[in-house]
């Protein structure tokens, strides 16, 4: 059967290995634990290095286990090509480094993961790339922030940690009007709940460590190229459209066509900086991917019940979740997430940091750690951990207060989760 006729739940299990492994007849994707690959002859080796033959060259660049994982995520996102790397942080870093140089500029929503914020606000400026952060609730701010040297707009489908939602299609129109790509982090959304490319995204990135892996056991990141952005017509990206002196004069738009973006990352950035995913991690993440839809359905089901419980609790000051009718992004939630979303969100306890810490320390089922999107329910205090690098003004702008608690709702029985939350709230 053709892939276009298959549903998500089938694709997440089969893409990349529709038949048994031809060498061993293994039905599971094998772990190809090797550093390098034998070329048939000298001409074959030259063709591989010249990008005329798309096969394996060296383990830092490609691996057959990794290749299945990349293809599967790309298909699930509706893209034409994918690249798996060592972590979500590496994926986001490469996504920007691939199309920026010293003197360039990025526009980003300010309601993003603290690690991404630090990358854009502090690390990339060391290399001459600056970022303007905007309030995504007013789309005019995106338009006003774009400059002649702006090379990308960056947002998340669901903001971290508050699960705010941005009008993707409207931001895409703004970016494309200025001939620059829209890069979206879909880690919290997952391709099961939303496919940003269908709403105008050009590049999608994931921390595969989260929902894709789903079990808190392996690090990984993925970059998916939609193949839709016209790098030549834009005229702003010589890295892709002009001969690359570091790769014997290749023009990536000629060598890779619509997959030029991810091909350049693999051929140059991954080659030179080596944030390579291990074959074993790619295998583990593939195992997680096969049950993505099943887990996400349970995550969302549990989360909505927890939101309702917290929203009616006398010791809770505020719940930040777009499913609530009074949430400012509720209409966007209904539009972009008809099947629900937001199993990672924040709420604010009455009092402050002392009460928040006492609540967290009293939980028994929820684990206090920095990860999210695990089958196990998780909790953390953002202001003193994940977002602690932000100053007081930056925290307030992201609506992270001393009493703010982030929850990542797992797949346990809902009655047990609510009972745990209830006993912990009773202690503050």
Please provide the spans of the model-predicted regions.
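Short hydrophobic/aromatic beta-strand micro-patches
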Residues: 224, 346-348, 408-410
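N-terminal "arm"/small-domain region of PLP-dependent enzymes with the aminotransferase-like
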Residues: 2-63, 71-72
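Conserved PLP-enzyme active-site core in the AAT-like
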Residues: 2-3, 16-20, 83-312
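Active-site beta-loop-alpha junctions enriched in small/polar residues
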Residues: 158, 187-189, 324, 350, ...
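Conserved small-domain helix->loop->beta segment predominantly found in fold-type I
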Residues: 273-276, 280-282, 287, 291, ...
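Conserved N-terminal alpha-helix of the aminotransferase class I/II PLP-enzyme fold
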Residues: 41-93, 115-123
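PLP-dependent enzyme catalytic core of the Aspartate aminotransferase-like
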Residues: 9, 80, 121, 130, ...
């Amino acid at each position: 059967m053709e892939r276009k006729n298959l549903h998500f739940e089938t694709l997440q299990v089969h893409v990349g290995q529709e038949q048994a492994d031809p060498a061993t007849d293994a039905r599971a994707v094998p772990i190809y634990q090797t550093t390098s690959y034998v070329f048939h002859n000298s001409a074959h080796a030259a063709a591989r290095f010249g990008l005329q033959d798309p096969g394996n060259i060296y383990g830092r660049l490609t691996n057959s286990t990794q290749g299945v994982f990349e293809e599967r995520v790309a298909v699930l996102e509706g893209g034409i090509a994918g690249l798996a790397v060592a972590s979500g942080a590496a994926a986001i870093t490469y996504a920007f480094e691939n199309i920026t140089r010293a003197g360039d500029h990025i526009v980003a929503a300010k309601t993003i993961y603290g690690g991404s914020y630090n990358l854009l606000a502090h690390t990339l400026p060391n290399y001459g790339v600056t970022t303007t952060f905007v309030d995504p609730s007013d789309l005019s701010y995106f338009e006003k922030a774009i400059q002649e040297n702006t090379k990308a707009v960056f947002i998340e489908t669901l903001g971290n940690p508050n699960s705010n939602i941005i009008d993707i299609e409207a931001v895409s129109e703004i970016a494309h009007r200025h001939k620059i790509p829209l890069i979206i982090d879909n880690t919290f959304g997952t391709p099961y709940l939303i496919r940003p490319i269908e709403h105008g995204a050009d590049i999608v990135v994931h921390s595969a460590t989260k929902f894709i892996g789903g079990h808190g056991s392996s690090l990984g990141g993925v970059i998916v190229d939609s193949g839709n952005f016209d790098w030549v017509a834009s005229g702003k990206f010589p890295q892709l459209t002009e001969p690359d002196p570091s790769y014997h004069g290749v023009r990536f738009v000629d060598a890779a066509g619509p997959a030029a973006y991810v091909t350049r990352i693999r051929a140059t950035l991954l080659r030179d900086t080596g944030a390579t995913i291990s074959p074993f991690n790619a295998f583990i993440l593939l195992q997680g991917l096969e049950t993505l839809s099943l887990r996400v359905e349970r995550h969302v089901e549990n989360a909505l019940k927890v939101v309702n419980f917290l929203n009616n609790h006398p010791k809770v000051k505020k719940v930040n979740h777009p499913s609530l009718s009074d949430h400012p992004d509720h209409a966007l939630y209904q539009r972009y997430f008809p099947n629900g979303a937001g199993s990672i969100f924040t709420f604010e306890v009455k009092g402050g940091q002392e009460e928040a810490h006492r609540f967290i320390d009293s939980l028994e089922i929820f684990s206090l750690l920095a990860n999210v999107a695990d089958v196990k329910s998780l909790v953390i205090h953002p202001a003193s951990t994940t977002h602690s690098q932000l100053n007081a003004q930056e925290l307030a702008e992201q609506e992270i207060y001393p009493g703010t608690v982030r929850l990542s709702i797992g797949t346990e029985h809902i009655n047990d989760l609510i009972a745990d939350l209830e006993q912990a709230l009773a202690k503050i």
